Amino acid sequence: VTKCLIDKISGLYAGDELTFRDKLASGIDNKSRMDTLEVFGDRVAGDAQADPKHHGGPDRVLHHFPREHYGHYRRMGLITAGQDAPAMGENISSVGLTEADIHIGDILSFGEVELQVTQPRSPCFKLNHQYGQRDFALAMQQTGMSGWFYRVLKPGIISCQDALILKQRRTDISVAEAMKLYFRPEFDAAAYDRLLSCEGLAASWVGSLQRRLERGSIEDWQMRLYGPDSLALN
């Protein structure tokens, strides 16, 4: 299966300065437009991560966010007219490719680089502070308009002129379906088993799904969605 998903992306972004908002370190709104990105096995050259445990590492080297989602979030009243790519902290912006079109485990070629889709973005409370909206992370979780992460199978250079090509499809679970299965509020062992069968799924998601099955319950999402009480927005 070789299929051109996008013949030209909208933008590539990276930034190495961390900014502070509400006393929180973040690399989310420091990204600048780049003509090319140099991609390594565990990082993008010139791209900083304030919280590598949750937003970096080998399973989350590149974040791809569909640009059309900005319009949806504007219509929901969650972001302003001036907020556009790369305000979600994305490295790759495109139009015409969404979470429904990409599957967990997909292997893609992009310029010199070979990538594998590992997980949807797990929305966290830093988004609430980024946009001054108490429930932004929850809205992203519920709508599924989160974008997705790639691991790097073959490093190299990518350019804005490069096409994104699907080389192999390894699973039948789209990023959109993975969001629904993972963030369903009711415990669902069958759904977790299905996700765990996905080749290429990020190790952090594998671990959390296995813990759910061992405990027979879902972890508390309050801290991820809203942060500590001292930082919660009213």
Where are these regions (language model features)?
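A short pocket-lining beta-strand/turn micro-motif at the edge of beta-sheets
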Residues: D35, S146-W148, C160-D162
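Short hydrophobic beta/alpha edge segments that flank linear recognition/processing sites
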Residues: A163-K167
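Active-site glycine-rich loop that binds ribose-phosphate moieties when present
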Residues: Y131-L138, Q142-V152
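Loop/turn positions that initiate beta-strands
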Residues: G105, P155, S159-D162
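Electropositive, beta-rich accessory/interaction domains or terminal extensions
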Residues: V1-H129, D135, R170-N234
